[in-house]
Amino acid sequence: MALSCQSVAQTLTDVIARRPVLKPVLRPFEDLLAARSALAGELTAAWTNSAAAGGSCPPEWQTERAARGLSLLTGAPLTGLCISVRTAAERLLPLLCAQESLASQSTALEDFFLAPPVLGPDSKPDRRDALARAMLSGDAPAFRNLADEAGLAPELLEFAAEFILSPPLRALAARAVQAGQVEREGPNSAPWDEEGAWRQGYCPVCGSFPVIGWLDKPFFEEKNAFLSGGGGKKHLYCSLCGTNWKFRRGTCPSCGKDGNGVMEILRESGAARGERVDWCTSCKTYCPTLDLRENDAI
């Protein structure tokens, strides 16, 4: 079943129409989000073009690694990713530094992200490649060291890095999906969508935790009624690399616990339009979730 998406501008307009109180929070990020989306689309189109030779290549999806809970990019060298990261920084840093919280750190951010790539065999590893490895592996000490060397607060570098690394990582994820489709000769699916292939609450590509989940709508397959379904399957979404994956409805994505009473569903009183928060009674984390069966606008 093919998926479609709308523009950043239209998405924000729809959200603000439903939640006017969010306008001053969302509008300042509109240009930045739109630029990130556009660049991710450009890199994805270039890297997944079979006639193109450029772009980084993701590792091959391995069922054995996935069974051990290892995301696709965990431990990947990522050498040379710095080139596309610099391209992303050239486009996104001016918009990032227009934000009040980052304006005073623009020089340090430019020095870090816009330096010429370091790719020689005898050269020290490029800091942008090291940054990507630290973020994808969850290596907090390495990340703090990079922030200290750059003269940036770790939380500030993380905020900027999540925007700047996102377009190249989304292109890598799309290339991994394409490789899986060629291998399995099936469209509109990824290797981690195979039944039981990925059972973790974190992203199968980059290892980040989801920012949102959703329950899908009922669907009808015209060519084969046996493939139709009542909907309600749960999916999670990673904002860093743009990956979606299936997940068990009664399980916490953060701590992995399941069973009766583990996950509580919190809704606002009145017409919630399928919007809710799935809250874990065990680890006290939560995931915003949208039940598309209850939302006719989507």
Residue spans of the language-model regions?
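N-terminal alpha-helical interaction blocks
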Residues: 5-190
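Cys/His-clustered metal-coordination modules, chiefly Zn-binding fingers
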Residues: 163, 167, 174-298
